[in-house]
């Protein structure tokens, strides 16, 4: 193998640049050429490839976003489009592709590998919704962003003696809400994986007031949604001023944390090692602080689990 390519796909995540840096420099270290693909699969089918060197990834390790830019590409589901992508890679002499993204990006890599392109996927998503790995690149940074927002909302909630609802990203995965709720000391955490009782929530808020609490923080995962409506209902029933804040895309931005940089660097280096071993259709993950590779098929088939014991602990200590 003489030449590889790398792209970022789907929603951006802090740490993607650190992963790009690791992939590029590890490949160059082993004498491989590296091509960067701009705008994910959409850029690939448009032939947006350029040669990368050490300077291309200089001083990006702590930058948020992705220097390659990213995009969603629904047409990549079409076989003729994927065949075009494979032909473009072949025309550039690219023998393997490293894909940094989420489950949709991995599916694209899996289908591309069936056309003879060696592929390896790195989990880059703030949602932490890939069950085969303990953590995804970007999750820790997003978590810290959310906790910072919760702490600031707590300041103003305390001043106004109100209830603050914070809606966070995560799609149908409640990990970001759960971890942020624990770290932010939220009185209630609402996630898609666990049943939610509005009456019990209102009871918790009122009991808090009886016990001397002057404010409450509620963290809601976007997979549940309805924060604005919930705020109106709480205020209507309790008479306590309640405000909802949807954090939105601020959760995807910012410089990656040290943990995300280290994780991205380890995973990026591992991706190149896996390709040099002749493997294909693999994804990189971390379990118990060990970096490993796994078949894409196997990884995508693992049913996502939710840490109910951690959720119960949060309920016990945060009320």
Curated annotation (Swiss-Prot):
Q: Tell me which SUPFAM superfamilies the record gives.
A: Phosphofructokinase
Q: In which pathway does it act?
A: Carbohydrate degradation; glycolysis; D-glyceraldehyde 3-phosphate and glycerone phosphate from D-glucose: step 3/4
What is one Pfam family matched by this protein?
A: PFK
- The EC number on file is 2.7.1.11
Keyword list (alphabetical) reads: Allosteric enzyme, ATP-binding, Cytoplasm, Glycolysis, Kinase, Magnesium, Metal-binding, Nucleotide-binding, Transferase
Its main localization is cytoplasm
Residues that bind Mg(2+)? 103
Q: Name one GO molecular function term.
A: ATP binding
Question: Does the record carry Kinase as a key word?
Answer: yes
How is the enzymatic or functional activity of this protein modulated?
Answer: Allosterically activated by ADP and other diphosphonucleosides, and allosterically inhibited by phosphoenolpyruvate.
Catalyzes what? beta-D-fructose 6-phosphate + ATP = beta-D-fructose 1,6-bisphosphate + ADP + H(+)
The record places the active site at 127
GO CC annotation: 6-phosphofructokinase complex
A GO BP annotation: canonical glycolysis
Which top-level enzyme class is recorded in the Swiss-Prot or TrEMBL entry?
transferase
Looking up InterPro entries in the UniProt record yields: ATP_PFK (IPR022953), ATP_PFK_prok-type (IPR012003), PFKA_ATP_prok (IPR012828), Phosphofructokinase_dom (IPR000023), PKF_sf (IPR035966)
In terms of superkingdom, the source organism counts as Bacteria
| Co-factor(s) | Mg(2+)
State the family named in the UniProt similarity comment for this chain: Belongs to the phosphofructokinase type A (PFKA) family. ATP-dependent PFK group I subfamily. Prokaryotic clade 'B1' sub-subfamily.
- Quaternary structure note: Homotetramer.
> What protein does this entry describe?
ATP-dependent 6-phosphofructokinase 1
Q: Which organism is it from?
A: Clostridium perfringens (strain 13 / Type A)
Query: What taxonomic classification does the UniProt entry list for its organism?
Result: Bacteria, Bacillati, Bacillota, Clostridia, Eubacteriales
